[in-house]
Regions:
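Active-site beta-strand/loop microenvironment that shapes enzyme catalytic pockets
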Residues: 77-125
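Signal for well-folded cores of large energy- and translation-related assemblies
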Residues: 43, 85-89, 116, 120-127, ...
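Conserved short beta-strand edge segments in small beta-sheet-based binding/regulatory domains
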Residues: 159-165, 191-202
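C-terminal regulatory domains involved in ligand/effector binding and gene-expression control
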Residues: 1-75, 198-202
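Short amphipathic alpha-helix segments
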Residues: 140-157
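Structural motif
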Residues: 25, 52-54, 92-96, 138, ...
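Terminal, non-globular segments
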Residues: 173, 179-182
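Short glycine-/aliphatic-rich beta-strand segments at the starts of folded cytosolic domains
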Residues: 127-143, 171-173
Length: 202
């Protein structure tokens, strides 16, 4: 699988359940540092809220995730939020749900339903985009090999990320993961035939 889904921009949803108010916010993120920054902002903005719960998912393989109940009964907040993320197969996303207690206890089952529904309120208005997993390949070659190297670029259509055309030339190419083996194979074959280029993958 070399595609994944994430959201384009932050979005928000609000849910009221038995006088408790749930404010859900979803953010596109790619690092733990970004997540910490968003959480700090939310905790400061909603300092008077009873609970600030969250869940996140990172990486195109969707293996880096966490759910936090922030004082709610175990498993009643973070996991339902994560469930809303999983049901949409999203990644590189943080969802925060703030709860203002309305005086009526919701019970364990009620909390699970409410937190998942609140997260869904935000995610239902999110603009979702499908992205490709791209890999990069460095090609080092002598200047006289320029035509052969660029012919492969034209035919395979990778994105040229960086280029340096001195006596010792270098191209950094980016291409969808599923197409990388063919691109690499073509340059390795050219290297075998000429001995005047070499390839390296990041």
């Amino acid at each position: 699988m070399d595609t994944y889904k994430t959201i384009v921009a932050p979005c928000e949803g609000i849910l009221t359940e038995k006088r408790s108010k749930f404010i859900a916010m979803a953010f596109p993120v790619t690092t733990l540092e970004e997540i910490k920054e968003h959480l700090a902002v939310c905790q400061k903005k909603y300092f008077d809220a009873r609970h600030v719960c969250y869940a996140y998912m990172l990486g195109h393989e969707r293996t880096n995730f966490r759910a936090n109940d922030n004082g709610e009964p175990s498993g009643t907040a973070g996991r339902p939020i994560l469930g809303a993320i999983n049901s949409r197969e999203l990644t590189d996303i943080l969802v925060v749900v703030v709860r203002y207690f309305g005086g009526i206890k919701l019970g364990t089952g009620g909390l699970i339903v409410a937190y998942k529904a609140a997260a869904a309120e935000a995610l239902d208005v999110a603009e979702v985009v499908e992205k490709t997993v791209d890999l990069t390949l460095d090609v080092y070659f002598e200047y006289p090999m320029m035509n052969e190297v660029m012919r492969i670029v034209k035919e395979e259509e990778p994105t040229v990320v960086e280029q340096d055309f001195q006596m010792d030339c270098r191209l950094r190419l980016s291409i969808r993961a599923s197409r990388m083996p063919r691109l690499r194979e073509r340059y390795e074959q050219l290297a075998l035939e000429t001995g005047r280029i070499r390839v390296g993958e990041e």
